[in-house]
């Protein structure tokens, strides 16, 4: 299977590269199809699509929606969306409006733990205050020398129970899937191997996702081991879900796979991009 990367990020959300830069970086691997999926926003899609067209690379409009499901935060990728669809645009805006207040609370929590200046420091890494995230705090903490690398900063400060973690109510699973499908796209559970869930809880998530109208699961992910990939291929097959593939690239040197670099899906999988042919933006001949 040719490289197909349907999950990566730009500076429009919490990536380190502009939409053009991240497409140019992916182009070095001669991908067959790309989709930019910034968190809770679609502002980088036009630039990314234009960059892909210049490079002769087929492109899908995408987004990654933050969801609260029970006590868990999960992410739902939307592929082949119309970013101008009013319900999707309004829903994403409602999510973004809560990010800045959460960031202020994170900064105050870190200051109470003895690390001052984190909110202002994180803002310097963020082009759009509406999109400030844990990743921007993490980059500040690494850059300031407080922590040696991104993996350590999340483990030490930015996960549940740690000083810089602030819980937040994101979109419901039903709303997120509804916005995506209503905008002409297909909804995909992103990087399921990252969630702190056992088999029973993952099964429940999949069933709730399908009941909401979800259609796919990210089998090949920069967050997944080969064992994870084969496990979620079996989940996809058992539940009749399409399989997707994405690097979840954010920045050079921050771990995981580089943009445009994905594993082949196991043979039992039904690739989701075959169902999205009509939504693919293809370079002019």
Curated annotation (Swiss-Prot):
Give residues annotated as binding substrate: 14, 39, 99-102, 134-135, 250
Record keywords, A-Z: Hydrolase, Manganese, Metal-binding, Nucleotide-binding
* Entries under CDD domains matching the protein: PHP_HisPPase_AMP
Paste the cofactor note.
Binds 3 Mn(2+) ions per subunit.
Reported EC number(s) for this entry are 3.1.3.97
Cofactor(s) for this UniProt protein: Mn(2+)
Function (record text): Hydrolyzes 3',5'-bisphosphonucleosides (pGp, pCp, pUp, and pIp) to nucleoside 5'-phosphate and orthophosphate. Has similar catalytic efficiencies with all the bases. Also shows activity with ribonucleoside 2'-deoxyribonucleoside 3',5'-bisphosphates. Does not show activity with nucleoside 2',5'-bisphosphates.
Name the record gives this protein:
3',5'-nucleoside bisphosphate phosphatase
Which species is this record about? Chromobacterium violaceum (strain ATCC 12472 / DSM 30191 / JCM 1249 / CCUG 213 / NBRC 12614 / NCIMB 9131 / NCTC 9757 / MK)
